[in-house]
Curated annotation (Swiss-Prot):
Gene3D superfamilies: 2.50.20.40. It comes from Staphylococcus aureus (strain MSSA476). The keyword Cell membrane applies. GO terms for cellular component: plasma membrane. The chain crosses the membrane at residues 6-26. The keyword Transmembrane applies. Keywords: Cell membrane, Membrane, Transmembrane, Transmembrane helix. Its main location: membrane. Belongs to the staphylococcal tandem lipoprotein family. Pfam families: DUF576 (PF04507). This is Uncharacterized protein SAS0186.
Length: 257
């Protein structure tokens, strides 16, 4: 009888210890996520940059892993892609180069269309642009008025978005490597997120499309200055081609999507 009682006491002790340890680990993981989100909030609070020409006066993060052949240059890139069955069907891409030395912003707007049935019908067009007084203007004449208006009205999320609102989602996972300062955020966003609303309105994406987000970059998470940022939105609807929006701000290195 005594041995039986000791057995149950030991079992109860093991269960209690397991609960305490598991609870402690859960709280530690939750606290770490809160801490990382607070750090990312400091980084994302430096946006929006409504006037791209203010980047002339902003220093970036020199990544020692990159060979900087093009010093003191910001690269801003965005792309809207339609992907079906692992193949690119359509892509609109804007790339701007912000030269801090010459105080000039130049770049191009590219359009790519691939025909599923006939590869010879695929098209690629590029339109050189520059930024003057925070407005995108063409360096060559564009005859299509709709396309011209679309490009001239182009805005990046770093200009018009609410990036800190991404952190309001309860379905996010954040990781950070303090030895390299690389971080990664991934998860789902609701249709109420202002960035999701803006992109769906801009690109006529179905309202019921689910949205996944991924944010990659390099930062000490103290918000001291602008760092390399790469932002991805994945929109999916049953029976529809996937839509991907990408945007990046990088210093002295062209983003590699």
């Amino acid at each position: 009888m005594k041995a039986h009682k000791i057995f149950w006491l030991n079992l109860a002790a093991i269960i209690i210890i397991s609960i305490v340890v598991s609870g402690g680990m859960f709280l530690a993981m939750k606290w770490e996520q809160i801490h990382l989100k607070d750090g990312l909030k400091k980084v994302l609070s430096t946006y929006p940059i409504k006037n791209l020409e203010t980047l002339y006066e902003i220093d970036g993060h020199d990544n020692p892993h990159y060979e900087n052949n093009d010093q003191d240059t910001w690269y801003i890139e965005s792309s809207y892609s339609v992907v079906g069955s692992d193949e690119l069907l359509k892509e609109d891409r804007m790339l701007l180069k912000v030269d801090k030395n010459t105080h000039k912003i130049t770049g191009e707007y590219d359009t790519t269309t691939n025909d599923r049935k006939n590869a010879t019908d695929s098209t690629y067009k590029s339109y050189p642009v520059k930024v003057v007084n925070n407005k995108i203007v063409f360096t060559k004449d564009v005859k299509d008025p709709a396309l011209k208006q679309k490009i001239e009205n182009n805005q990046f999320l770093i200009q018009s978005g609410d990036l800190t609102s991404i952190l309001n989602s309860n379905d996010l996972k954040v990781t950070h490597d303090p030895t390299t300062d690389y971080y990664n955020l991934s998860g789902k966003l609701s249709n109420d997120n202002p960035n999701v609303k803006q992109l769906k309105r801009r690109y006529n994406i179905p309202r019921n499309a689910s949205t996944k987000v991924e944010l990659k970059g390099m930062s000490d998470l103290k918000g001291n200055n602008h760092q390399d940022q790469k932002l991805y939105f994945y929109f999916s609807s049953p029976g529809k081609d996937q839509i991907i929006y990408k945007e990046s701000l990088t210093y002295n290195k062209l983003s590699e999507h």
